[in-house]
């Protein structure tokens, strides 16, 4: 991990621990110079800033480095006059935070598509190509950290590039509510309504939080109607489908269901490895396959935690001056994750899949090529690969001594089917639950 990336992670921890005024005053102008012998070197603009940071924030910086895996967290401050400092370090925080902007990291190009998110991705691409005409509104739901916000921002970037004249607004439900409260208090409702009802693409994150807020629901109802009737595109994200959002007004629920509702599921093992590979490549790093697979097997819940685990492993290796191997990754994550044992026995997976299809296990592992056996066998190979540590050659041996290329073909075939066939997606979920 580069020294800039290490410092960014340190800043994220510090920002959660102090006030915004403190952060902007003392940390916004610090610049990382490099990492030498495990010591993070930082540039500050004045000797006064150096002394103040050393006396008041040294422990916080060391704590942040320790969380990244540094065994002996150390940093060094150096005065570099060229580093710009705020003119007024006692400047008050702005009355209103700047409006959210699209995250430049969230694009279609770096969104890893897998069986868990293929439909949501396809719908988002369709909307980006023809906003206001395809799937309006588009409602994307799924657990925390699975890529809903990434897809929304990706649509925003794509629309901005294709249709630069269109006005785009991204907002979280919390921000929408807070701005509404401020607008009511300051008698600026006309301005508030104009802001949201004059856009061509409205992206609303975490819309489940609108539930139970009567005035917010009332205002959003009219905003939704104004945009929909003008054929403007609306994209909503939530952690659950509209029917499961308790205390959501029926009229809003019905409107959320007017367009397309699509979900994002947790990524399977192959998709998690692909996500880690892309993250590593974006940072110009080549990480051994077995190290990536180890991390992918430890973090199964969501992409945000998966990427966080990778960053921790990279930082641990960088700060301790070692190569990132499987063993180093295990050490870096040891205090967060207990080593995950095999989640299922390969033979048990084969038996469960055979039972589901009314077959005998030996029919799946045998050489028969009957049509009714081919797909169950491919599904069994796929699940053994996902739910155990068995290598491709080992899986081949389980299935009658088949070549590893045959196993790889079966896995890829199931992935292709799952991307386009919701029945196969559901079948995989059912079998996965039965096997774990």
UniProtKB/Swiss-Prot annotation:
ATP binds at residues 145, 147-149. Residues 101-317 are annotated as: Domain III, AAA+ region. Keywords: ATP-binding, Cytoplasm, DNA replication, DNA-binding, Lipid-binding, Nucleotide-binding. One of its GO terms (biological process) is DNA replication initiation. GO terms for cellular component: cytoplasm; plasma membrane. This is Chromosomal replication initiator protein DnaA. InterPro entries: AAA+_ATPase (IPR003593), Chromosome_initiator_DnaA (IPR001957), Chromosome_initiator_DnaA-like (IPR020591), Chromosome_initiator_DnaA_CS (IPR018312), DnaA_C (IPR013159), DnaA_dom (IPR013317), DnaA_N_dom (IPR024633), DnaA_N_sf (IPR038454). PANTHER family: CHROMOSOMAL REPLICATION INITIATOR PROTEIN DNAA. One of its GO terms (molecular function) is ATP binding. Its main location: cytoplasm. The lineage of its organism: Bacteria, Thermotogati, Deinococcota, Deinococci, Thermales. Residues 80-100 are annotated as: Domain II. Residues 1-80 are annotated as: Domain I, interacts with DnaA modulators. Belongs to the DnaA family. The keyword Plastid does not apply. It is found in: Cytoplasm. It comes from the Bacteria. Plays an essential role in the initiation and regulation of chromosomal replication. ATP-DnaA binds to the origin of replication (oriC) to initiate formation of the DNA replication initiation complex once per cell cycle. Binds the DnaA box (a 9 base pair repeat at the origin) and separates the double-stranded (ds)DNA. Forms a right-handed helical filament on oriC DNA; dsDNA binds to the exterior of the filament while single-stranded (ss)DNA is stabiized in the filament's interior. Domain I is involved in oligomerization and binding regulators, domain II is flexibile and of varying length in different bacteria, domain III forms the AAA+ region, while domain IV binds dsDNA. Residues 318-436 are annotated as: Domain IV, binds dsDNA. Pfam families: Bac_DnaA, Bac_DnaA_C, DnaA_N. The gene is dnaA. PROSITE patterns: DNAA. SMART domains: AAA (SM00382), Bac_DnaA_C (SM00760). Oligomerizes as a right-handed, spiral filament on DNA at oriC.
